[in-house]
């Protein structure tokens, strides 16, 4: 990545594009696999679409960042909880890949209540010549079998199959907001509003409760769990965030189940900022460990913060995402925008941070140069392999030609979900029902 992020030239391309969107088409999860060769998206209709990267050729260097549809399958269906008279949406809340161990790929997907483990594999041969079955798979009468045949494998068109290998259900009373694969690759955790459960991939009927903040009296409830993630290298360590802006680092060696809500990382409250809207805006919507350093990144409504695990009382870095909205928090509360859950991601070297905003804008912050840039993902100003231009939001009355007034922002167009290729400067951005790929300019 170039040092001057303001002058960076970025190409973009569409991956998924609908001229008209239904509620089911809205993308709700985006995730690269560990190599970056596959990119998975989930939507509110319960579908998972997997894209595969085009093989690079010497004659088509400009296509090095292009992805095509690899597999599509229905992960979750709408359900109804008859005991509680509640509808369970099919919406995919999170997708997490497992490291590839063989020719097949494995991923976790979850809706509000159920986590599923999927196997995605290729098949280019089919068996023929069964003795007890005919060519259509029907059983043959043994009395008609006069010769013994040896089954053989015949070539066939490549078929990508997605099959559910495990279904992890009936363990969450509240809505699941996070799943995270442990670094031992044998376990993973799922977090809802009040509890975090630890699962073994081989056991579907039992999980262990490793965090519980539910009070004895629900009238005393003051916060909920908003996000959780395992440490990328230490299998005993995980972190979770809360709606009060607190971050709790937990060690499973110290306690089998973390109870209560003690503060671990939290910025002191500003006595001058005690309004109800500002308290809501301090709720953390995403938390991520860095890959290279002992840092944690959090996203609240207005900012992205980076925390050093050795400094509990303040973040070491704070980046303003859309500070121009601070004066509009009351109206954003009235239209429920203040409850939007924005995600944040690191690049492969943890040197650049990316997160979304409104009007289909997304922000990038270079931690080394302290430069930032606002870019837009939209069909109106973007064509495949076009170069994106930085955008600026004007707060005052006067604005330049290339600026947009804060009063003109479209709050129905929001980028909540983003993903960064693990080793290259290729990013995926979900803008409502459209998926965009961006990459550094190819010379």
Swiss-Prot record:
PP2A consists of a common heterodimeric core enzyme, composed of a 36 kDa catalytic subunit (subunit C) and a 65 kDa constant regulatory subunit (PR65 or subunit A), that associates with a variety of regulatory subunits. Proteins that associate with the core dimer include three families of regulatory subunits B (the R2/B/PR55/B55, R3/B''/PR72/PR130/PR59 and R5/B'/B56 families), the 48 kDa variable regulatory subunit, viral proteins, and cell signaling molecules. Interacts with TOMM22. Interacts with IER5 (via N- and C-terminal regions). The B regulatory subunit might modulate substrate selectivity and catalytic activity, and might also direct the localization of the catalytic enzyme to a particular subcellular compartment. WD repeats lie at residues 22-61, 87-128, 171-209, 220-260, 279-317, 334-375, 410-442. The keyword Nucleotide-binding does not apply. Keywords: Cytoplasm, Cytoskeleton, Membrane, Phosphoprotein, Repeat, WD repeat. SUPFAM superfamilies: WD40 repeat-like (SSF50978). It comes from the Eukaryota. Its main location: cytoplasm. It comes from Sus scrofa. InterPro entries: PP2A_PR55, PP2A_PR55_CS, WD40/YVTN_repeat-like_dom_sf, WD40_repeat_dom_sf, WD40_rpt. The modification Phosphothreonine is found at residue 298. GO terms for molecular function: protein phosphatase regulator activity. Belongs to the phosphatase 2A regulatory subunit B family. SMART domains: WD40. One of its GO terms (cellular component) is cytosol. Disulfide bonds: none annotated. This is Serine/threonine-protein phosphatase 2A 55 kDa regulatory subunit B beta isoform.
